């Protein structure tokens, strides 16, 4: 497998190349008889969106398979893509997670969902895109308190190529978000996206 590829970079200026690269990953998973489980919002968003397109657009599927046949692959449009947090919440369940908690956490946690975990909501439909609860409930089952804060659903600031194209603007977004969650009493941030995590970590240091 290769990069998902990154939705905010390749997809934004060359969708056909993005779709072909994503389809290669989907085809490799299909070849093993497995679905895909991601731990990254960007990978989840890219692969999920590509799988949705190829499942619903026969012409794009034919076009992609013409490319894939050059590397000995073919995709049937049926590989499922899941996010790790989604699987813990829906397949393992809160009760099972709670039964394994030995030392409940007593802390205030700010949850950051990130853009690609929930959107586009018309095809993902994992949770309410404006008032989601999956991560909040996973946090609270550990004994921690998931706090509400201003502009909770705002982007981390780095997405869509903003970090590389306009780092000052990206930093401004992140600073605003960090100020909001700190004002609400957050001690920790929980995220499910390595790119968001890097942006929060890097901006605090800067």
Where are the regions that the model predicts?
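Iron-sulfur cluster-binding electron-transfer modules in prokaryotic oxidoreductases
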Residues: 1-206
């Amino acid at each position: 497998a290769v990069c998902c590829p990154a939705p905010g970079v390749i997809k934004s200026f060359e969708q056909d190349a993005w779709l072909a690269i994503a389809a290669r990953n989907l085809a490799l998973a299909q070849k093993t008889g497995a679905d895909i489980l991601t731990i990254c919002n960007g990978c989840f968003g890219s692969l999920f969106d590509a799988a949705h397109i190829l499942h619903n657009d026969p012409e794009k599927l034919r076009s992609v398979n013409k490319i894939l046949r050059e590397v000995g692959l073919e995709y049937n449009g049926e590989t499922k893509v899941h996010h790790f947090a989604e699987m813990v919440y829906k397949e393992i369940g809160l009760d099972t997670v709670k039964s394994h908690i030995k030392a409940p956490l007593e802390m205030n946690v700010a949850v950051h969902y990130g853009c690609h975990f929930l959107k586009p909501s018309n095809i993902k439909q994992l949770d309410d895109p404006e008032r989601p609860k999956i991560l909040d409930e996973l946090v609270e089952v550990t004994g921690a308190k998931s706090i509400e804060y201003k502009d909770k659903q705002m982007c981390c600031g780095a997405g869509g190529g903003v970090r590389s194209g306009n780092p000052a603007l990206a930093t401004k977004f992140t600073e605003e978000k960090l100020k909001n969650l700190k004002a609400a009493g957050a001690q920790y941030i929980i995220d499910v996206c390595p790119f968001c995590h890097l942006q929060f970590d890097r901006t605090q240091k800067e």
